[in-house]
Structures are given as C-alpha cells and as structure tokens.
Amino acid sequence: MSENDNLQQKIERMKEKYRVEREKRLRSDGSDQFVEVKGKFSYFSQDPYAQDLAEREPIEETTDIVIVGGGFGGLLAAARLSAIGYSDITVVEEGADFGGTWYWNRYPGAQCDIESYVYMPLLEEVGYMPSEKYAHGDEIFEHSRAIGKHFGLYDQALFQTRMIDAEWNEDSSTWKVLTNRGDSLYAKFLVLATGNLTKPKLPGIPGIEKFEGHMFHSSRWDYKYTGSNDRNDLSALRDKRVAIIGSGATAVQVVPNLAESVQQLYVCQRTPSTIDIRGNGPTDKNWFENLEPGWQEKRIQNFTNVTNGVREDEDLVADGWTDLMHKMIEAYREKKRGVDLGVDPTSLA
C-alpha cells in the first residue's frame, strides 16, 4: 500500500467518524431542546453585577434616535451618529452599564479570539492601546465603558431597561418605543443593536430543576459564591465538587481556572471542541505608537477581506482565522487544477 493510499484511508475513516457524530446531534426538536430561562428558571437570567434596580419614574420624551443595545453595535452607532452632528440620542440597555456581551459574560478566563486591534472599536478615537493581541473580557468591558465616557453617552442612556414594543406612526413619521420601565420614547429613527450573546440558554436535562446544589449560568457568574468580585479569586470553591455542562468556547476558557481552584471537577461534554494554539502576546508599544492615522479602519477592512476570500496584497493580521482562509483557497485552487488532495475545502471551515 502506498503512502498516499494509507493517507486516503485515514481521511475516509476520519470523515466517517465525524459523519456518525454529526448524525447523533441532528435532532428533530432543534433549538427547542434547550430550556428557556423563565418561570422557575428565571433566576438564571438575573443580573448578579448590579446591586439593585435603580429606581426612577417612567420617562416620556421625544428624541431624534433611539438605539436599543449598549454593546459594541450600539456604542458604534451612537459614536458615529454623534460624529456627524446628532446629539439627541437615547440608548436603551438592559444591563446596568455599557458592554453588551462583555457586561454579561464575566466568567473566569473570558477572552476574545479575534485580534484586539481589529475587534475593539474606536481605539484611535479613544486613544487606547490594548494590552495584548487577544484581549481578556475585563479589558474589553472597560474599553466599552471608556467609549461611553469619551462620547458622553452615559447621560443619554437608560440602563436596566428593556424595549418591549416599538410602533411606527405613519402620520407623524415617528417610532414609539415602549420599555419595561413604563417609558414612552418617540423618535425619528430606531436602531436595533441587540446582539444574540446575552441571553442564557439551559440544556434540556431531565431533572435539572431538582438539583439541590448551587447552580448558575456562566454568563451570570456568581462571584459572591465562588470567591469575590475578583475574576481571579475562586477560593470559595477549594472544598467543592464542581460540574460544568458544556465544552464549547466558554468551557475552554473556564475549565483551566476551575481545575486549579476546586477539589474535584467534572466536565460534561457532548461534542469535543476544536483546540488550537492561542498565539497571544503583549502589544508591542513601539509598533503601536508608530501606526499611521487611519490604521485601524485599514486593518479591519484587510481582515474582513482576507477572511472572506477577497484578494489582498498583504495579510496584516496573519493569525489562525486568516490562515484558515488561505488554506481553503489553496485547496479550491488545487481542486480546480485537478489535483486531489483528499480534502474537501469546505471541511476545513
């Protein structure tokens, strides 16, 4: 048997293995397999980072623009609109601060796998240098707050407030936005920047409601129980047996921290995660300070183009994301030339 034949057999066995595993996870109930955080499970969605609900009277006001969401989407919208002259803006945010995903997800080890010089917006405008190539969650959260302060958005925000309805009035050409705090906001424009990574999702495990131990969701990390408000302090778990359900990106970041801190750790895994090198490191201050004005927009566009298969003369980011696209493009080219590498380019994604 030739070396190529042996390689092809290994590839086929691997494909079959993943086909079988994939079929195990194809379910007729789809996303309905998960339990909604309401009723007896509503406590999973409570905000552990805000002391109390800030009391205020319902507001009825007219504004130019209502932005729903105080994460990067909402912050960018507000910042860009402010830059072109709009000052009458109201931001509606369910959390008690800006940050969106990074307000809610404060679990130990939280980190972004997109390069900070691309992912963290408005670095030039705010005048901030990320501390490392792939920033941790607390730094990203603080940058969100810095954006809010830099553009004066705190005075224009309604925190701990959720939009419950929006109605368009054709006669007056205005939106009427209603909130769970009894507010009625009238605006010419409505911007929805709500995102999809802020709502907890529970596994549909029979009997989960009967568990008698302490239980919380990673996106509502209970630091009062695990140690303190310090993300590095899990000292209260030293004598605890802990189970974590799930082995996705969050677990990959949480598990090493838990393993060092608890008496015994159980990781409940259905599907193994893809693991690769982190490739992280501190920001080169000299490099950063010598970047030319407009560098971030150029870098973001370059990264977007490369990861979407658009030809660029230079790969400015040159990390795992861009390398993956380079490999896919090369596999497609080889296939087009009639060279069988034994690899379906789409399987690389």
For each predicted feature, which ranges?
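Glycine-rich Rossmann-fold phosphate-binding loop(s) that bind the pyrophosphate
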Residues: G69-L75, S247-G248
